[in-house]
Amino acid sequence: MANKKKPLKKQKIRNSEYYDMQLVLDELYAASVKGQRFCNLVELIKHPENIKLAYRNIRKNSGSRTACVDNKTISDLNKWNENALVAHVQRKLDWYIPNAVRRVEIPKDNGKTRPLGIPTIMDRLIQQCILQVLEPICEAKFFKRSNGFRPNHSAENAIAQAERMIQNVGCHYVIDIDIKSFFDNVNHGKLLKQMWTLGIRDKKLLSIISTMLKAEVAGIGFPEKGTPQGGIISPLLSNIVLNELDWWIVSQWEEMPTQRNYVHRIYANGTPDKSSTIRTLRNYTNLKECYVVRYADDFKIFCKKRSDAVKLFEATKQWLLERLGLETSPEKSKIVNLKRHYSEFLGFKLKVRTKGKKPDGQPRYVIEAHIKDKALLKIRKKSKEIIGQIRQTYDPGMEYRLIQTYNSYVMGVHNYYSIATHVNPDFHKIAFDVKKSLYNRLKHRLQKSGQITNRYIKEKYGTSREVRYLNGHAIVPIAYVQHRVPMDKKSRVNKYTPEGRAEIHKNLAGINMAVLYHLMNNPCGKQSVEYNDNRIALYVAQKGKCAVSGVELEANQVDCHHKKPLVLGGNDSYQNLIIVSDVVHILIHSSNERTIRKYLKVLNPDKKQLAKLNKLRVLAEMPELVF
């Protein structure tokens, strides 16, 4: 094997490469871009490598441990022989009949509940098999400003797009439309027709999806409409439904054909410069200038004129009802003048304010983004709840875990809401109440001095005078947060092209904050406080990468290994621990030849990686491996 350093990769992309599926998925994407039709997808879905990839992708997903009506979880699938599991999935797909779906009611902030439909673990595996094949086909057809439930898209991208429309384009009228119970009212027949239009012409696959949609809900019956939230494939199906809405709105302005075909130069970030086309549409047509930004079923339409917004508001409601059979909520749907009122979007509230004047003497408007009022109240309530839990325990281990839970929660909301322009004053509104709760409940145990062992907390919060310590553990100050500019997704980023994947890997140089929060919030219960603290410190020090393979790790793959095992006299010190992937950890300790061969094939180490692996095996008093 070559000694060339392997690039940093997202784990699902690596999984695809392990099972030789990435090239196939790339070809599906490229064919979909060209408008080709797909008539034999079931055979690809049933391919053994696709099934193995699906199993790996769901194996350590936190939801895989949730039981359904058959009381089975991923641990039951783990007992299957690999070939037997593949054969069983293939047989089920030959004549697919889904099991009943377990219905769970999740409480919402407004006091109501959101129904979740949880399929059995075997049905989830089959849905993952289908998702892997359908996703590249659909990704080629989806609109660029559709952000929810899509690879490499996020809420931050949606906020960045909305702010660009408001501040840069000057769209100060926003159409807010709320779809009544969207997920419960999706028309099954319409959805299947939309899939057919996207080029998915495999009738057997469409029949399987139709059967999935009509799966019995335990205790309720067989649904006639809707996509059950909780299913692996449901987010993709919901995007297929609303993709037609995206392109209908885009066709009203951005994609309106002109008599002259303009040649668009490409910006450095990969997006085309359409200024010539837009200028022509503004000067020579009476079309309504409008732009849509969507995140799942939450979408905004931005307009420059109120008269345009009024017409589009009525047209969109009518189109949703007649075309998709979806009703809108008259109480929540409205037109907002951003110069006077706020428009709420994804936990933020957006408005514009004047700041100086333009060269022509007209007022210059800039974005003003706050945390939504309900979100602030929720943050305050949750923070005080965790502080109350810390107050009620005097067990050092439990106290440490709760402090980590509090810190990860505060860091998480800081990270999400830091893109609000007024994030600092917003957090100061609740900081007094939270700090008062902290001092009143823990005043005799809090200290102002101490040492921060978590490197990330030290780098981000170490200069704050508001950091407090409880038995030597730092508590993150809730008001210590700064604004950062929201970033849109680069158009080149794409998990289904080699160039797009290279861009993804290039952007993964920092620490994955979601994984860090997970580690802080989920310490190893059977391990010491020292072990858990060093586990987090090592994850940060190693930049979230496996010490052997150099691969960035997902939360479910981070293993903290004792170089010298405890049974051989090792300890939980920083020097005796190292972060490795779950696959590497198995290879360090395994003595079973079959297991070793299996996971060496998965890891596929080069000479340097094998040398690192063998060094750890020697320290654990295991024989060296040959590959």
Model regions: which residues?
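Polybasic, low-complexity binding patches
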Residues: V567-Q575, L587-F627
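Non-catalytic, polymerase-adjacent accessory regions of viral genome-replication enzymes
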Residues: M1-N83
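A conserved non-catalytic segment of reverse transcriptases
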Residues: K214, G219, L324-D395, V410-M411
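Conserved polymerase palm-domain catalytic core
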Residues: L85, L93, A100, K141-R145, ...
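Histidine-centered nuclease catalytic patch
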Residues: D178, G550-D582, S590-I596
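Short cysteine-rich loop/turn motifs with clustered Cys
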Residues: S528-D559, S581-V583
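Extended C-terminal regions of large enzymes
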Residues: I430-D433, N440-K526
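Non-catalytic, peripheral interaction segments enriched in hydrophobic/basic residues
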Residues: R391, M398-Y461
